[in-house]
Amino acid sequence: MKRHLFRLTIGLLMLAVCGWDCLVCGAHPNGSSCNQYRLIEGSTLVDDCTICGRPTLLIPIRGSFYLEPNEIDPLFSNFGVRDLKFTSVGPYWTYSGKLEGTYRMGGEVAVVQQMKLEGIINGIEGLEFDSNLVPLQATFPWIEIDLEQLPPTNPLQTFRLHLVAVAWPTVWFSTEVSFTPSAPGATKVSDGDLLSVTGQVVCTNNQLTGRLGIMPIVPDIGLDAVMWLIPSLHQQKGTPTPEIWFSAERDIFSETLGPLHDGDLLSNAGRIVRTYADLVAKFSPMPPVPDFGLDAITLGPDGKLLFSTEEGFFSEKLGVSISDGDLLCEDGRIFKTIGQLLAKFQPIEPRPIQFGLDAAYVWPSGEVWFSIEADFVDSKWGRIGHGDILSDTGRVVARNSELLAPFGPIEDLADFGLDGLEVFGSVLRADFDQDGNVDFRDYAVLATSWRLNCCTTCPAPDFNCDRKVDFTDLKIFAENWLADVE
């Protein structure tokens, strides 16, 4: 049925939405795709007056851009920087900018980088910036770079940019407390629901637990650890679709599976993936093995399960005490201690803190994104909350308030916590609302962008960043739609 509906609606899209003009639009010859980047905390704009005595203004900024791969020459990887938009953060000054340009990275001996941008800041047009060739300040795909404004400059207002950017993939998470979105008619979001940073509820707690055989009326059992397995990583027979693996926040009884513990790893397909005893078995904790809980779950670079527990314990095999903040591997080794995860941060508290490890995601490179259970004050970043996403590179990837902003909670809380975290580059690029499938809501996004035709920015459906949503993008959308049918 979905196939037939798709064929019909594609025809309607061509004629009713874009009109006959779309039949003469050419496809972009470069089939490369754009990667969305996000300007994170640490990005700043400097507003300086070189001939007067006013203070130099250091303005925190946030924003995003698209990094488009271009040709690779013998020495450099070259990229286009598309649709870089930023706004100021804070109540004192209002700045906004829109820039575009190029970025290259490489070198013959040492690895260097260069970014060139041009555009508008606060209505001032024709601004140009150049970093020149400078050493890397961060390991790619992170980008950290300083850009100076090129002459001619206005001595009364000269700008400089410091950009800290990270590739911003699909991010799912859960909170520690429930909240009410501000959208009219929105229902309360549970601390057991799985959410997307786009402001969507990916999966309610009842949808996650619906096949576990819990006696109705099924209560909300919370959501602690979470991960999403795509088919390329999980090829279990009889499981044709991806599964969400998760842990609950309390014990409950299943009529089909028996007792379910908060330390068990469960599947929305209706099975126990690992019991709490299975997960810690190779660490040889002192018997009898209690339920230590399950706080974080993710896959390591080698495909093995990594996890953290809610309680520490002593490993007879390793001869050490395991902290509730350590990231453990199911093969019986410590992947990273909480000390290693926080090594590049600088807590200023005079007393030891039990940080804990509430959520974690490990990139193929080994970089870890994570959240902790206790707030602390850092000498560089200030207060770090238990709902912030941190990187073991020593950066704050996203504040809890930024994650919740698309929902607009009406509750006045500084931090809603972060219990579960899953990060992945979307398997289906046309999954614009990041709910795990391509459906009519994504189709509506495509149709809306198509009406713009020859757009001046790169909307999500402009897969190849050629500034228009045309048949090349429609082909990719169709492939994603039909792939979601299989």
Q: For each predicted feature, which ranges?
A:
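Bacterial N-terminal signal peptides
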Residues: 9-21
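Cellulosome-associated attachment modules in secreted, modular CAZymes
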Residues: 170-189, 245-271, 286, 306-322, ...
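A recurrent domain-boundary module in secreted/ectodomain proteins
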Residues: 147-167, 413-429, 479-480
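Predominantly extracellular/secreted and cell-surface proteins with exposed
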Residues: 50-161
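Signature of short aromatic-glycine-proline-rich micro-motifs recurring in repeat-based ectodomains
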Residues: 217-233, 288-298, 350-362, 412-425
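Bacterial N-terminal signal peptides that target proteins for export
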Residues: 1-10
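Surface-exposed loop and turn segments in beta-propeller and other repeat-based domains
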Residues: 200-218, 270-289, 332-351, 395-424
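N-terminal segment immediately downstream of the Sec signal-peptide cleavage site
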Residues: 28-74, 168-177
